[in-house]
Amino acid sequence: MTEQVQANETETPVAVADERIIRETGIDAKVAGIVEPVINTLGFRLVRVRLSGLNGQTLQIMAERPDGTMTVDDCELVSRTVAPVLDVEDPISGKYHLEISSPGIDRPLVRKSDFSDWAGHIAKVETSIVHEGRKKFRGRIVVGEADSVTIESDQISYGNEPVVRIPFDLISDARLVLTDDLIRDALRKDKALREGRIPGDDLGAEPEDAASTETQEKK
């Protein structure tokens, strides 16, 4: 069993107003339901849960601070806190490795605010049903609205509309595409955030592409 770590009293639980619009299914959804309240209490937001067959079984929990940052120390705090909860709830059969990570630069887009925050950058979007004759889209995020996002294709192909409005409730998966512009913008945002922080804050670390803890074997 992993030692339980209590949230620091100075941490502010995350508000639930900006809930995820893309959610897990199956065992991933079960795990998300267990860990999301714990992660929120620590002052972080859950991005994604994914159980894969990597190294036997690997449970990846992706999280971030409300400002989009996540350091190795943050990942370790989340790991130490959720591990004992998972031990008690025991949602996964067999042994598995627990990995806590940041979203990285080419991050998944799981909230409405993610689309507006990264407007102007290229994303890949998949829908749960056929929309405008297809289920896969790629293009620049033009604007994120209350109930939809508009994508302008950067690779126009015959028969496909160059600009498509996609309702959020149809999106099953979405993530940013790694480009030079995205890297520059991500580093610029990270620098601005660090300069605005109180000196000594543990978030004043080097920008992280994908900060993560070492995986720990469970059971």
Swiss-Prot record:
Region annotation (Disordered) ranges: 195-219
Keyword Cytoplasm: yes
InterPro entries reported for this sequence: Ribosome_maturation_RimP, RimP_C, RimP_C_sf, RimP_N, RimP_N_sf
Stored CDD domains: YlxS_C
Localization annotation: Cytoplasm
Keywords of this entry: Cytoplasm, Ribosome biogenesis
Chief subcellular location: cytoplasm
Domain of life: Bacteria
UniProt GO cellular component terms: cytosol
One example of a Gene Ontology biological process annotation: ribosomal small subunit assembly
PANTHER family the UniProt entry points to: RIBOSOME MATURATION FACTOR RIMP
Function: Required for maturation of 30S ribosomal subunits.
Family: Belongs to the RimP family.
Name of this chain's protein: Ribosome maturation factor RimP
Lineage summary: Bacteria, Pseudomonadati, Pseudomonadota, Alphaproteobacteria, Hyphomicrobiales
